[in-house]
Amino acid sequence: MKNIIIFLLCVISTNCFAQYTTIDTVKYQFNYATKFSEVEELHPFDDEIVVEIGKDKAMTYGYWGRANDLAYDSIMSHGGNAADYFALGNPIATYNDYVIKNYPQKGLLSVTTYHGKKFIYSEPIVEKKWQLEEGDTTILGYNCRKASCTFRHRSWNVWYAEDIPIPEGPWKLDGLPGMILKAVDTKNQFSFECIGIKENVNKPMSAKLSKRVKTTPVYIERLEKLHSSNFEAYLKLIGSPYASNPKMSKKTACLLEYYEKKDTKK
C-alpha cells in the first residue's frame, strides 16, 4: 500500500502543493508506529505518525492523514472523483492533526484540526516536569533512558536517546536531552514507538495553514467530547446539515490531553 502512495505522491500536481505553506527545511525525519484510543470503551487503533525536525521548528502529523489528503487532492485535480479515491483502499487515518512547534513564533506551537471546519489554534509550549526512572532500553540500536511526567491530566513514560541530542519527540512531548523514541501513557490508551529515522532529509517542511478558522484548544476539546457523548449536539454545534442516528450509543471521549477536568455541553 505504501508503494501506491509513493507513486501518487510522485505525480501530484503543483496545484496540490500550492495549498501547503513552507515553514522550514526538514533535517531529520522520525516515523512512529502509534496506537490511539478515540473512546474509553474501545481498544486503540493502529496508525503511523511522522515527526519532522527542521532548523528551528518541529512538526508532527499523521502519515496516512497526510498521504490520504495528498492522494485525494491529486485525484481531484486530475478530474477524478471521490469514488476514484475510495477505490485506492487506503487505511483510514486516526490521526489527522498537525502539531507545529515554534510556529507562528518561537515559544508557541500551533495545531491544525478538522471538525466540520478547518481550525487552527496556538498556545505556549509548556515545560514538562520530567523525572528520571529505572528501566533503560534499546530502540533502533540507540541506548534510551526512561523518564516520566504528567502532562494535562495524562501520565507518560518515555524513552529518549541522548545520542540524538534533539530535545523533541512525538506530538507535544519534548524537553529531554535527547530525542524521545518511545512514549506510552500509563493507561495504555496511547503509544508512540519509533520505527524509522532519516537524516539529511533536506526537503520543505510544509502544512495546510491558509483558510483556517482560529479557535482555542478548550473549544476543540469540547467538540471532541461531544463527538463521542452526544453526536447530535456535535452536528448542531459545527453547523452540519446531516442528521445523527438517535440509536447511536453514547461513549466517553479519550483524549491525548485534557484542558478541562469536567465535560461540558457547550
What are these regions (language model features)?
Residues 1-25:
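Bacterial Sec-dependent N-terminal signal peptides
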